[in-house]
């Protein structure tokens, strides 16, 4: 599983995956957990303990992946973990299909937001994730996330302590839409956030065109050229050819 350098650092990010998902992406790479086929129930006390265990192992942060539908539990577990001695940042890693009122309950609890901006167009969102309202909801959610954490703060080792990194996963045949998402982010937030341009899309079996193929080198370079044209300063890119099943983590319940 790839994370941006200020998140993964040298010791890695303490990742906790949550079963289920608020979206139904047809190309989902984590279907085993997103569709409820894998996972183990834990108490709020145990969740707080897991965070402490990850800190003890040297993780730079606690990385909560697809946590949207567990916000009430997290609003209890995070303060509990802090009282038990948790000092590293909390990362909220989300597809951005998040209710703003729910996000507000995490104000002061989350240090770093790591949201996706999957789609700019309603038709794409409906076709690929059965969520035509995604563009509006995601933009509203990202705005609330930024309100909470503001501009980025790093420690002396370059590890992010606070801030937001918005991810744009380039999908095959969707360069124009990725450009629109990137321009929206830069027009709205400028250099106050980081943007991660990702090419790691890995086609799952049975996908129809164009989702049945990887992103081409030309597609990714077109997006990077556009980012340079817009003057993107705070950004991350991936080496080309990173799309593979190595980016799909094994959900073996380790550490639960």
Predicted feature descriptions by range:
Residues 55-80, 127, 133, 143, ...:
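Conserved glycine-rich "GG(E/T)P / GGGxP" loop and the immediately following alpha-helix
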Residues 150-256:
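Auxiliary Fe-S-binding modules of radical SAM enzymes
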Residues 78-91, 140-148, 217-223:
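Alpha-helix-loop-beta-strand connector modules within alpha/beta enzyme cores
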Residues 14, 62, 90-92, 113-115, ...:
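Hydrophobic faces of well-ordered beta-strands that scaffold small-molecule active sites
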Residues 126-157:
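Anionic-ligand binding region
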Residues 107-122, 192-200:
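Non-cysteine beta-strand/loop elements that form the S-adenosyl-L-methionine
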Residues 1-112, 121-122:
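Conserved Radical SAM active-site core
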């Amino acid at each position: 599983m790839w994370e941006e350098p200020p998140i993964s650092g040298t010791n890695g990010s303490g990742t906790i995956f949550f079963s289920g998902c608020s979206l139904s992406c047809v190309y989902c790479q984590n279907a085993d957990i997103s569709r409820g086929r894998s996972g183990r129930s834990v108490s709020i006390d145990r969740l707080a303990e897991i965070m402490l265990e990850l800190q003890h192992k040297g993780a730079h942060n606690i990385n909560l992946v697809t946590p949207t539908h567990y916000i009430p539990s997290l609003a209890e577990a995070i303060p509990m973990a802090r009282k038990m001695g948790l000092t590293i940042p909390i990362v909220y890693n989300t597809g951005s299909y998040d209710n703003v009122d729910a996000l507000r309950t995490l104000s002061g609890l989350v240090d770093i937001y790591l949201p996706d901006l999957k789609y700019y167009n309603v038709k794409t969102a409906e076709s690929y994730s059965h969520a035509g309202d995604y563009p509006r909801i995601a933009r509203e959610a990202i705005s609330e996330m930024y309100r909470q954490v503001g501009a980025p703060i790093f420690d002396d080792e370059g590890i992010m302590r606070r801030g937001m990194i918005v991810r744009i996963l380039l999908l095959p045949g969707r360069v124009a839409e990725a450009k629109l998402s990137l321009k929206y982010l830069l027009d709205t937030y400028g250099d106050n956030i980081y943007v991660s341009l990702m090419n790691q899309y890995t086609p799952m079996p049975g996908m129809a065109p164009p989702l049945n193929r990887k992103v081409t080198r030309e597609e990714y370079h077109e997006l990077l050229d556009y980012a340079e044209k817009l003057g993107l300063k705070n950004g991350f890119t991936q080496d080309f050819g990173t799309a593979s099943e190595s980016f799909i983590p094994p959900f073996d319940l380790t550490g639960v």
